[in-house]
Amino acid sequence: IAFGKWLNVGQTCVAPDYLLVDARVHDELLGLIKEEVRRMFGEHPLDNEDYGHIVNAKHFARVRGLIDPDKVVLGGAAREASLKIEPTILDGVTPEDAVMQEEIFGPILPVLTFESLDEAEAFITDRPTPLALYIFSQDRSVQQRFVRYVPFGGGCVNDTIMHLATSHMGFGGMGASGMGQYHGRESFDTFSHKKSIVNKATWLDVPFRYAPYASWKRKFVRMFVH
């Protein structure tokens, strides 16, 4: 999860935009993610040369404006001079919060909880169809439920990002997140134009398709239409 969220400082179109976590494992999971962030970027990520920059000042200001200080449980600091924002986790987020109203495209991970799988499924399906969905569960029935019945472009089970790293599978969105796929064979099909052609024989021409449309022609056509 930490890899997928903070790869390129969250500036990928398939970075997790929010984390929907079972309330029973919420505290444990957040603790593990915090540990991993510190392991990857250190205690002072703004000083880490391997930790990236936000692409420009306008984007920096937009992303920083999504941080609610009252909900920060990790990170939250920013340095405008270098266009860096710490890996940030917001906990106790609600669907009405500003950070849930748009694609983040930055190093902020909002965390929400659910009590049942029905609640989790409804939360996802009530929102615009995502480009990617990542399911973390060892239960095959849970995996299949979300893969089969929740609309999304593509994704992973127990991983993030890696579904677009292979040319053997198509990559693309669905509905609000786009239509069509590319990568591998899908690229060839998507960017090729298939021409539909009727090649009519010259030795026969069916006259009833031409005007005037006498009653016998209408009856003849109805035989095939109905």
What do the predicted segments below correspond to?
Residues K84-H226:
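Conserved C-terminal structural/oligomerization subdomain of aldehyde/semialdehyde dehydrogenase
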Residues I1-P95, L117, V157, K219, ...:
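ALDH superfamily catalytic-core signature
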